[in-house]
């Protein structure tokens, strides 16, 4: 059954206003293995500063492939709720639940948007709210961030990753991403190659100059150590990912502190290209 919401989503993809993230995640599932899943668990443990999530509830906002919902479930989360606005991403998350979730796992999967304040409010409060690289693709990043903060319980944690603001460079990337989504399908791969290969060639050349040419090769072969991800699928996601918004770390801090959040951990991309990661704790009411 096609709902009005799914027709709107399909229309946005068709018109070039939105990247089909779920299709890229579907391809990622073909390379997903136990090693990548283990790396996803490691990344959650490291950023949250916990060995497990036993007894905690976990909300995955924009679940994408479903990998981190799965990781949370495997770390012992008492309850996992995943939602995504992209129907293909919902399908990916359901597929991972089917493949890997043990019997009795409390893991709900739904189709919804982080911009739907009523939906987010209806979910109640969670111990961990996770949204990695999602809110800046909603089309209204600050509204989406405001919505998801309401799902964090007192003393709970908010773990987000937001694209770093590079000023004029970010504007150029926004134009490239918009172009990707307006191109016919056969022209998209050539654009990815044209945009990213010069960067890759420069990285390879630096490895050669340092006398360590295999470092570049390992950057590809060992990439699964980066949150269990795939470098190629991340490149496609990067070039195509649209809508596209950015923020400086200070803007995120200034937005969340008045809403009762304290920064617990931050991992930036050094002012360059990529996402800044934040873990906040919600202060209990006085």
Regions found by a protein language model. Give the residues of each.
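N-terminal, positively charged/glycine-rich alpha-helical extensions of SAM-dependent methyltransferases
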Residues: 1-36
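Class I SAM-dependent methyltransferase SAM/SAH-binding core
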Residues: 71-116
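Substrate-binding/catalytic lobe of Class I Rossmann-like enzymes that use SAM or dcSAM, i.e.
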Residues: 184-258
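A short acidic, Gly/Pro-enriched loop at the edge of an enzyme's catalytic core
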Residues: 119-128
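Conserved alpha-helix/loop element of class I SAM-dependent methyltransferases that forms part
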Residues: 35-54
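A short glycine-rich, Lys/Arg-flanked "PGG" loop and its adjoining helix->strand segment in the class I
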Residues: 142-154
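Conserved class I S-adenosyl-L-methionine
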Residues: 56-62, 157-190
């Amino acid at each position: 059954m096609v709902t009005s919401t799914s027709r709107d989503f399909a229309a946005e993809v068709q018109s070039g206003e939105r990247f089909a993230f779920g299709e890229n995640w579907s391809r990622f599932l073909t390379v997903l293995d136990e090693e990548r899943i283990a790396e996803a668990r490691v990344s959650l443990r490291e950023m949250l500063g916990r060995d497990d999530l036993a007894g905690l509830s976990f909300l995955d906002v924009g679940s994408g492939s479903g990998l981190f919902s799965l990781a949370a479930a495997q770390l012992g989360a008492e309850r996992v709720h995943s939602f995504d606005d992209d129907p293909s991403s919902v399908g990916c998350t359901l597929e991972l639940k089917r493949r890997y979730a043990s019997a009795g796992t409390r893991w709900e999967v739904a189709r919804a948007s982080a911009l739907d304040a009523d939906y987010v409010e209806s979910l109640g409060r969670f111990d961990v709210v996770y949204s990695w690289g999602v809110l800046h693709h909603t089309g209204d990043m600050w509204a989406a961030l405001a919505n998801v903060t309401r799902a964090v319980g007192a003393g709970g944690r908010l773990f987000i990753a937001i694209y770093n603001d590079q000023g004029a460079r970010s504007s150029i990337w926004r134009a490239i991403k918009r172009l990707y989504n307006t191109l016919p399908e056969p022209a998209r791969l050539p654009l990815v190659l044209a945009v990213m290969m010069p960067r890759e060639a420069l990285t390879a050349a630096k490895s050669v100059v340092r006398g360590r040419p295999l470092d570049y090769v390992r950057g590809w072969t060992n990439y699964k150590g980066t949150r269990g991800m795939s470098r190629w699928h991340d490149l496609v996601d990067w070039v195509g990912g649209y809508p596209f918004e950015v923020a400086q770390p200070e803007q995120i801090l200034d937005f969340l502190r008045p809403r009762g959040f304290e920064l617990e951990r931050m991992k930036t991309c050094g002012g360059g290209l990529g996402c800044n990661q934040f873990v906040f704790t919600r202060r209990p009411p006085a």
